[in-house]
Amino acid sequence: MEQSMELSEPTTSTTCTQQHMLNDKWVLYHHLPSNKDWTLSGYTVLMDNIDSVEKTIALNENTPEKMIKYSMMFLMRDGITPMWEDPRNRSGGCFSYKVINKFVEQVWKQMFYLACGESLGLNDSYNTSINGITISPKKNFCIIKIWLRDNKHQDPNMIHNIEHLTKNGVMFKIHGDS
């Protein structure tokens, strides 16, 4: 499905002078499925410097459902590119989940919050190993991945339980095997 999708400027309903800072900064990338340029120039940065709870909420709540379902998005830690060849990804791998379209928006938004809040894994070791999350559309479902910097953390039971994200059939793929 080729269409122009834009992210509206995040807004908040109230003015908040105090920012609740995240432990790390994040960057949200976008890549159209029809784009065959897999170099970094083929990606668009939708928002960088995602460094506060307020920015996370505003961005996540203003991301259109169609963008989540029909384009490729990559939420990565600041300084890590959305490519497995990145030195901080190369020795790692990813969990790969199949999520039907009916639940994609709900699952993606929950994972987005948990990743930014360093709570996607059930312990600090898992959370610090997580480099990002990605979504890729297919016909009636999407593939959502959790990218890790190493391949020591291959137990999907150590990932936070998310409704409609089943651990049955989840695969762990080492990036070097791609």
State where each predicted segment sits:
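Conserved NAD+-utilizing ADP-ribose enzyme module
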Residues: M1-Q18, N23-K25, G42, T63-S178
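Glycine-rich loop/turn
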Residues: H20-D48
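Short helix/loop capping segments that flank catalytic or ligand/cofactor-binding pockets
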Residues: D37-W38, A58-L59, D155-P156
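Generic low-polarity alpha-helical segments
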Residues: M47-S52, I162
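A generic structural signal for alpha-helix starts
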Residues: D51-E54, F103
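Short active-site loop/helix that positions an aromatic residue
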Residues: E54-E65
